[in-house]
A protein has these predicted regions:
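N-terminal single-pass transmembrane signal-anchor helix
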Residues: 2-31
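Short, functionally important structural connectors and interaction interfaces within domains
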Residues: 18, 27, 35, 90-93, ...
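Membrane-proximal N-terminal amphipathic helix
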Residues: 35-62
Length: 151
């Protein structure tokens, strides 16, 4: 009597399961690394956009195109001012420097650490006079070992 066997043996199932587990153990850390690298690239871009907007505002203030209070350094008072727009001397419309305040990809919030021109370099507290620099409020560490707040 000939018996035809259909299906898989237990050994075959164990081998396939082990192979899938090995592949998954390699794929998950690689995916996490890739996602973190993408968020870091987005953070760099967002910081660059905001810093360029601050620099553009300062340049126009120094040229007298934006009215600033006497005794101030010519930087915006808030990030919101960059997104809402400011009146330009001799023009009817406001000039916007940012479309919107970006969301920090590390914290998931549109909240950023701020430094004013009068603050100490690398200070973690904002004096509130103006916005001279921005940084991430994330306490995390980047792939290169630096802290996000130091970027």
């Amino acid at each position: 009597m000939k018996r035809s066997s259909r299906g898989f043996t237990v050994a075959e199932l164990v081998m396939v399961t082990a192979l899938v587990a090995i592949l998954a153990s390699v794929a998950v850390p690689t995916a996490r690394f890739t996602m973190k690298r993408e968020r870091e690239a987005e953070l760099r871009l967002d910081l660059r956009l905001m810093r360029n907007a601050i620099d553009d505002y300062k340049r126009l203030a120094d040229q007298g195109m934006i009215q600033v209070e006497v005794g101030t350094e010519g930087y915006p008072k808030t990030l919101e001012e960059l997104a809402e727009g400011v009146p330009i001397v001799g023009q009817l419309t406001k000039r916007k420097f940012l479309r919107r305040i970006p969301i920090d990809p590390m914290t998931g919030k549109a909240e950023w650490g701020l430094r004013s021109y009068q603050d100490e370099m690398n200070s973690d507290s904002w004096g509130g006079q103006d916005v001279y620099d921005v940084y991430s409020l994330s306490g995390g560490t980047a792939l290169d070992g630096t802290k996000y707040k130091d970027w």
